[in-house]
Design a protein with these regions (language model features):
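Residue-level preference for long, well-ordered alpha-helices that form the structural scaffold
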Residues: 13, 20, 182-189, 221, ...
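Short coil/turn segments at secondary-structure junctions
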Residues: 11-15, 177-181, 213
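N-terminal glycine-rich anion-binding loops that anchor highly charged ligand groups
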Residues: 2, 26-30, 35-36, 41-49
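Active-site anion-handling motifs in enzyme catalytic cores
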Residues: 23
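Structured binding elements
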Residues: 209
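Generic N-terminal amphipathic, Lys/Arg-enriched alpha-helix
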Residues: 1-18
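Active-site-proximal beta-alpha core segment in soluble small-molecule metabolic enzymes
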Residues: 40-206, 228-235
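Anionic-ligand-binding alpha/beta catalytic cores of soluble enzymes and soluble regulatory domains
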Residues: 212-246
Length: 246
């Protein structure tokens, strides 16, 4: 939303992306409050915003950035000035080397992926995570629901059990089940994670709660979000909590 009376659009080159830094600063103040009062880390999702000209500003109000491809991981390293938290549904022999060169954390979508590439990541000192499917998502359209029956996005608790549990070398769990969602949806997601994966939470170092947190919306209850995250941290004090709002 732009206040047109303050912008002379005739002087703006077209096509272009136009960003109102005042609105961005307002949103970042909300993010800062959540980081400060909840103790959770907030990292920037490049799939939602890859405008590298504002990376210096975003870097001052975040704890890093997340990538979903080799190109995004390279952009984080080169323009954000630090290695990326990387997750992609698929890694290949052709791109895994570049991705690892640009990453500090990498999340694997399956146990098979970790068996294939995990040793390479661990040898480089990269923190490895596993995407899990907590069997809950508020997304109503099956096409976009990552937890729909038959989903290949993440590992279910039953799959972990049949494969002998969480493998050595996995330091984090990652779920991504929200989309423009409220704090009450995150609460239900965390309840599902504790119900299905609670036995592993005190064995790992970090829990990435993915994106879809609409925390800068006027109707979003940030007080509830902060209380929810603090309560979860109190139950699992060893865990680093990570959010990836777009």
């Amino acid at each position: 939303f732009f206040e047109q009376r303050m912008i002379d659009f005739k002087r703006v080159p077209s096509p272009c992306f136009l960003l109102d830094e005042r609105l961005l600063a307002r949103n970042l103040s909300v993010v800062d409050r959540v980081r400060r009062e909840s103790g959770a880390e907030v990292i920037v999702a490049l799939k939602a915003c890859a405008m590298w000209s504002i990376f210096p500003l975003l870097a001052r109000h975040s704890d890093g950035a997340t990538a979903s491809s080799a190109a995004e991981a390279r952009l984080v390293r080169e323009e954000f000035g630090q290695p990326a938290h990387t997750y992609a549904p698929v890694y290949t022999d052709r791109n895994i080397g570049e991705i690892l060169d640009c990453s500090s954390h990498i999340t694997f979508n399956s146990l098979g992926q970790f068996r294939r590439f995990g040793a390479m990541a661990l040898l480089r000192g990269i923190s490895c995570g596993l995407r899990v499917n907590p069997r809950y998502s508020p997304v109503e359209t099956d096409l976009y629901n990552p937890c729909v029956a038959g989903s290949r996005l993440g590992v279910t608790a039953e799959e972990l059990e049949t494969q002998g549990g969480l493998p050595d070398g996995i330091e984090g769990l990652h779920f991504h089940v929200l989309c423009e969602s409220r704090s009450e949806h995150l609460r239900k997601a965390l309840e599902a994670v504790e119900r299905h994966f609670g036995r592993y939470l005190d064995r790992i170092q970090w829990l990435n709660m993915g994106g879809g947190h609409l925390m800068t919306h006027a109707d979003y209850d940030c007080d509830d979000l902060i209380a929810l995250l603090r309560d979860f941290r109190a139950r699992h004090p060893r865990l680093r909590l990570i959010l990836e709002p777009g």
